[in-house]
From Swiss-Prot:
GO molecular function terms attached to this record: ATP binding; ligase activity, forming carbon-nitrogen bonds; zinc ion binding
GO biological process, one term: queuosine biosynthetic process
Cofactor(s) recorded in Swiss-Prot or TrEMBL: Zn(2+)
E.C. code: 6.3.4.20
NCBIfam families (UniProt xref): 7-cyano-7-deazaguanine synthase QueC
InterPro entries: QueC, Rossmann-like_a/b/a_fold
Catalytic activity: 7-carboxy-7-deazaguanine + NH4(+) + ATP = 7-cyano-7-deazaguanine + ADP + phosphate + H2O + H(+)
Official protein name in the record: 7-cyano-7-deazaguanine synthase
Residues engaged in binding Zn(2+): C191, C199, C202, C205
Role, per record: Catalyzes the ATP-dependent conversion of 7-carboxy-7-deazaguanine (CDG) to 7-cyano-7-deazaguanine (preQ(0)).
Domain of life: Bacteria
């Protein structure tokens, strides 16, 4: 029997790297897909390349989809300052990139169908996240219906399953799963900024640092994150 294939949306961050390791542990032949969308830096793409090597993923596609041409987010528009953590959790932050996950999953669906993959693995998380609307379970359910209706394989009665194994995990749970699966956490990149070292102050850094410290791995957190935890 042929080994099943899965496309992994690999950003280079902790969640997507852990998701890739889960797909491999589930018996899939992984096809990694990394997308540069015009964000402030290439750190994530560089991290994705390291993760692919460490996890032994043989097929890796990197594409550019430059959403910075129209901006609309602090991550794609240099004129908008990246906010520090601690914003109103009930508001969608300016770091939300309009339509990003919809664009990403659509491209992953194209790749999956072309490669005969049975699944698309996503590092989406709806617990410890920044309030993005395209990280919710109901969003994934809606996109699954779209995938079934818009693909040749779907019309033929089969499906390319969207799998988000971390969607209901806390960030602490994700850290612990990453450690168990041998994910190179130190090689992942979550910071919104593109400096030599993570800033430790943006929302993404703060969520990550708190989880690393709570899970018992403070040495993997930023120095700022360790100081703020006291």
């Amino acid at each position: 029997m042929n080994q099943p294939k899965a496309v992994i949306l690999l950003s280079g961050g902790l969640d997507s790297a852990t998701t890739a390791a889960i797909a491999l542990a589930s018996g899939y032949e992984a096809i990694a897909l990394s997308l540069f969308y015009g964000q402030r830096h290439h750190k994530e793409i560089e991290a994705a390349q390291k993760i692919v090597q460490v996890l032994g993923i043989k097929e890796h596609y990197s594409l550019e989809v430059n959403l910075s041409q129209w901006g609309g987010s602090a991550l794609t528009d240099q004129s908008i300052e990246v906010p520090k953590a601690g914003l109103n959790p009930h508001l969608i932050p300016i770091t939300y990139v309009p339509g990003r996950n919809t664009v990403f999953i659509a491209i992953a669906l194209s790749l999956a169908e072309a490669k005969g993959a049975q699944a698309i693995y996503l590092g989406i998380n709806a617990i410890d996240y920044s309030g993005y609307p395209d990280c919710r379970p109901e969003y994934l359910e809606a996109f699954q219906k779209l995938a079934n209706l818009s693909s040749k394989i779907g019309v033929e009665g089969k499906t390319i399953q969207l799998i988000a194994p971390l969607v209901k995990d806390s960030k602490v749970d994700i850290v612990r799963r990453a450690v168990r699966l041998g994910v190179p956490i130190a090689d992942t990149w979550s910071c919104y900024q593109g400096e030599d070292e993570p800033c430790g102050l943006c929302d993404s850094c703060r969520i990550r640092d708190r989880a690393l410290i709570e899970a018992g791995y403070p040495e993997l957190a930023t120095e700022i994150g360790r100081k703020l935890s006291h």
